[in-house]
Amino acid sequence: MASTFKNAGLDVGVLDDSTGNMYTAGGSVYAVVHAIYISNENATNLAKVNVKVTTDGGSTFYHIGRSLEVDVNNTLVLDKPINLEPNDILRIYADPNPDSSSVDVEAYASILEIS
């Protein structure tokens, strides 16, 4: 079995759809997400982010975190391992800002792939 370290990055949007897919494990790949860093670059609005994964190869999502608060100009770190099986998806999206301004959130994940 080969092990490969991967990095994934995402400009986080507000839609709970495929545009929020940060990482998808390949068809014959198992993956361990070591950590997720979610940064709110907005100097005014608190960000609320949602983190979900599939457990069945990409169709049924379950929340790891719902409306997790990231303070202004700050970073939230999820540092416990998340195991993904082949075709599983890691998705991140934000709740819209109350003043209707654009969210300014970035996310980064450190991932170990095993194939």
Give the predicted meaning of each segment.
Residues V32-H34, A47, R66, D88, ...:
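A generic structural signal for short beta-strands and their flanking turns/coil linkers
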